Structures are given as C-alpha cells and as structure tokens.
Amino acid sequence: MKYIETYSTNPYYNLALEQYILENRTDDDYLMLWQNDNTIVIGRNQNTYAEINADAVVRYKVNVVRRGTGGGAVYHDLGNLNYSFITREADAEKIAFEKFVYPIIKALRKLGLNAETSGRNDIIIDGCKVSGVAQRYYQGRVLHHGTLLYNENLDMANEVLHVDPDKIKAKGVKSVRSRIGNIRELLSIALIKNEIEASADIAQKTADEAAGKLGNPAEGRKMIEQFGADLSLPAFWAYLKSELTADGMQQEQLTPEELAQVEKIKTEKYDTWEWNYGRSLEADIVRKAHYPQGWIEARIQLDHGRIKDARIYGDFMTPKDLTQIEQSLIGREYHEEEIDKLLEDVVK
C-alpha cells in the first residue's frame, strides 16, 4: 500500500484526485489523508436541495459537492480529517465495511476512546457519531472513505445542513448538533479519566502494578505528551498516519501529467452545477420509505397517469445503477404499490 496526500483543501479537487487514483492507479493499493474547507458533501443518490440550508450556504459561502459514493450529507471544515482506502479486491462488491473501519477504530481505542461501529456506516464514541463512511466499487477495486470529526464547528454543521424531520424522528434526536461529537472533546475527557484512574491506582499499588492494570501503560500521559496541551489536529493527523502506516508505507506523488488529468476531472465533473445540483426534480408524487439500509425516496412526474420522469434519492448505499432504474420507469402506468416494491428492492 502507498500513501498519498492531496496538499489541497479544495473539495472539488480532492474528490477528483480520489476518483483518478481509483480508476487509473490500478497497480497498487492506496491510503489518503485529506481535508476539505467549509464544504457540504452530498451522497451520490441524494437530492441536494433537500439536504442543504440554501440561505446559509450562500451566507457562509459554503462549497457544495456531490461525491461518488452513497450515504448521507456531511459538513467538512478544517476541524475534520478525511481518509480514503483504495484497494484491489478479488470480489470487490462483497467487501464489508468492517475491513476498513477496523484500523480506524483500533487507532481511536488506543487513545482510550470507546470507539465502535453503529449501523452500517457510522463510528460512534460514547453514543456520539464521530465518523460516517461510504464505499463504492470500480472494476475490481474498492474506494472506502470516511470523515473523522476532530474539532469541527458543529454549530455551523447544524446550520448549513437540512435534516428531514422524518429522519430526526426516526433517530430520536433533535438536530444534527445533538447526535454528533468531536473526537478532541471526547479525547480530553478520556485523557482526564485515564489520569484519574492512574492516580487512584498509584495511591493503592506500586507504579508497576498500576501500569499493568491500565493495559496500555500510562497511555493517557503518553498521548498528552505526544499531542501537546492543545491536542491539535495536526498532532492527531500525525498519530493516525503513524498508526495506519505502521507496517511501512511508501509516500507517492502524482506526475504532472496525472495532475493535469485530475484537474480535468475536477473541472468537467465535480466543479459543475450539473453534477452537484442537476439531479433534483420537481415532482407530482413523492414516495418515501425507511429501511435498515437507510432512507429512500422516489420523486415522480406524471402525464395522464403515466410516469413522465422519475428520480430516486436516499442516504442508502448500493452498487445498483439508479439511472437505469429511473429510465425503466418512464412510460409506465403509475401504481403506488409497484413503486413501493421497487424502492424496497433498490435498497436490498
């Protein structure tokens, strides 16, 4: 596996680079660590206008970009750290998320954090979501990526993202802000807890016995020394990089010719209105359903009882070609039960 940094906080460029590596650097496996500044990233199958607070996006000059993977909308700023695994797999579409999530959870747990998976595509710490992940497949290769909320402006995320009231009701939460958390804050709590527990042990036993009881000897103190008093994101970046590249990993640079191709993908795809907003559809009928795999919605235009146009949206993840499914509906008579059955089949 080789390591690549984007050296950019431009979301349109970063997603273009990711796509280029997935589709063209097929000779090896890659790890990327990167950041986007002041950006909403929309899932591939989502209705952009339904996911953003358009007034706030304009007011705060927020970038909006659609990624190539499924899942839900997320806010990125320079308090986030994003990671991507791009690997060759013999049976790519059967690769479970856990293969890629495990090393991230392992690294977080080494810091004393109670990290675990929640559902199919979230990482939580003490009930707070700190990461959402997604993946897609391309000719025997897998792109798996996720965002780690380290010190994000959560109030900004809450303001610029629009959450469907049905989703909030289903999850039993009141807002984006109430269900996500920052690793830095949770890490501070964990470090303090480790210090208290270590001090209590030392008061009762010898220092050696206390260290043995802690599992990772004095891990809290070690991380305070490594991260510094401010627990900065650059220190967390360096820590995560060291954990994920512990077995030795060559850092790779793209050639000028390759970088020109990345710019071409950025300009012609990710930095266009058509890609980021163009899937939206004014509808006569909206059918919406929630399954364990996520939310799915069909927006349908009718002409004399027949389907004139259709779009399928959602925060689910699927390798199926939604465009082909949408096209297959055009010209058919509209029957509610058939649409509901189709939506169920899409997310299976």
Feature annotation, model-predicted:
Residues 189-229:
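Intrinsically disordered, low-complexity terminal tails and inter-domain linkers enriched
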Residues 256-303:
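Structured beta-strand/loop patches that form or line metal/cofactor-binding pockets in enzymes
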Residues 158, 167-192, 224-252:
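A conserved active-site cap/scaffold subdomain adjacent to cofactor or substrate pockets
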Residues 80-121:
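Contiguous, small/hydrophobic- and glycine-enriched helical/loop subdomains that border
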Residues 113-117, 123-180:
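Internal, well-ordered alpha/beta segment that forms a basic, Gly-enriched binding/recognition surface
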Residues 180-183, 302, 306-348:
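Active-site- and interface-proximal helix/loop "cap" or "latch" segments in soluble metabolic
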